[in-house]
Amino acid sequence: MPASHEASNYDEVSMQQSMLFSDGLQDLKNLRAQLYSAAEYFELSYTTDDKKQIVVETLKDYAVKALVNTVDHLGSVTYKVNDFIDEKVDEVSETELRVSCIEQRLRMCQEYMDHEGRSQQSLVIDTPKFHKRYILPAGEIMTATNLEKLKYFGSSLEDADDWNQFRNAVRATIRETPPPPVRKSTSQSSSPRQPPQRSATFSFTSTIPKKEQDKRSVSPHRFPLLRSGSVATRKSASISRPTTPSKSRSITPIRYPSEPRRSASVRVAFEKDNQKETEQQQPSKSKRLLKALLSRRKTKKDDTLYTFLDEY
């Protein structure tokens, strides 16, 4: 109801304004005829009447009023025309604004529909899945270097054949590259291992003089293993001891509990060193045995012999 009432009021106002505008235009048209008739009347009265001064003054007053009315009519008509034009321009601009709002809403609806359609299509589309494969250049064989150069573009091998092929290739590379030797003891020396062919030279140490034996005992080739509290220091100490007979001395070295456990290769080298030491000590044993036999039948005239043996 209020919308229809406003519409009716708007129509009534517009009709009144249009009627006033038409009346103003009609008055302007009638004003021309009135001015012409008034001019003819004053012309006749000026020629026939004796009182010409009164006729002239009356003509002046009428002309001024007619001019004022004409200007008033022209101003009112101009105002009405401008008001009508402004009103129509406002209506046109308002209509354009409404049309632009409707177009914007349509664009937003279209974009939203396109977005929803793409999202639904992305959920429906089933993307193809390809198997991940290792591609080698022509003429190359899978080795350890080639395995490092391969680029893997997936997280898992889905095909069973590909997985078996890859596993066989890895096994082949593992068989080709032997594992490095594992050290059994961390306390083992970093010196080069004693070659086995030198063990044959120990059988001839009994015929070598004592000075040459002392010189060779310092050689690193003869005693390759050097450790804290090592065998080399104990062997040098045993060589520097005087050759006096002692029952408590034994050939086998004493093994201390704090000494780390040695590997099998170290034991073999140590046994060879013990064998060499026993061979070096054989002349001194025979010397001590001879001295012990002579000491039982010691006389004053044998003192020179004992001193000679001690010096020897």
Curated annotation (Swiss-Prot):
This protein's GO cellular component annotations are: cytoplasm; cytoskeleton
tRNA processing recorded as keyword: no
Q: Where is this chain compositionally biased, Low complexity type?
A: 183-199
Quick one: where's region Disordered?
A: 173-287
Q: How does it assemble?
A: Binds SCAR.
Tell me, what does this protein do in biology?
A: Involved in regulation of actin and microtubule organization. Part of a WAVE complex that activates the Arp2/3 complex.
Q: What is its main location?
A: cytoplasm
- Name of the encoding gene: ABIL2
State what protein this is by name: Protein ABIL2
To which protein family does this belong? Belongs to the ABI family.
Q: What high-level taxonomic lineage is stated for the organism?
A: Eukaryota, Viridiplantae, Streptophyta, Embryophyta, Tracheophyta
InterPro entries in alphabetical order: ABI (IPR028457)
Indicate whether Nucleotide-binding appears among the record's keywords.
no
Compositional bias, Polar residues, is annotated for 230-251
The SS bond pairs are: none
UniProt keywords (A-Z) are: Cytoplasm, Cytoskeleton
Q: Where is the protein situated, by its record's location annotation?
A: Cytoplasm, Cytoskeleton
Q: Where is the composition biased (Basic and acidic residues)?
A: 269-279
The scientific name of the source species is Arabidopsis thaliana
